[in-house]
Amino acid sequence: MKLALGFVAALAAASMGVSEALAEVTPRAGNLDARVRYAQWVDGQVYRIQTQMGRVTSVEFGPDEQITSVIAGDTVSFNFDAVPGGSAFVMKPTTSGAATNINVYTNKRQYYFEVSETPAAQFSVVRFTYPRGSGG
């Protein structure tokens, strides 16, 4: 019986670790302005971005990256545009309360986002940083 309880406890602990690992990450606020956000790239991570009606949000990747594809679930409630240079794009919500996912592919990495329009706490820019050895 003790062995069975130990197994159940270990299984529960392992499943909690998996759910935490799959959680979305909100990019951290910059030191000077909370609207400037920073996210460390992690393969397979989903990043949460908050947008606001009437405002654009930029997403900036490493200077050596070129965007090859931006795919969004809802292309009616959000507008997307490339930024010259190819390592950034902007998004702007057109519908209040809209939410979608966006997958971005570059010549080096893949990025996954959950984006929502909210009247509070809009991000002006999300800038990615890269761990050593990730090619960034």
Model-identified regions with their sequence ranges:
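Bacterial N-terminal signal peptides that target proteins for export
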Residues: 1-8
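C-terminal segment of classical bacterial N-terminal signal peptides
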Residues: 13-20
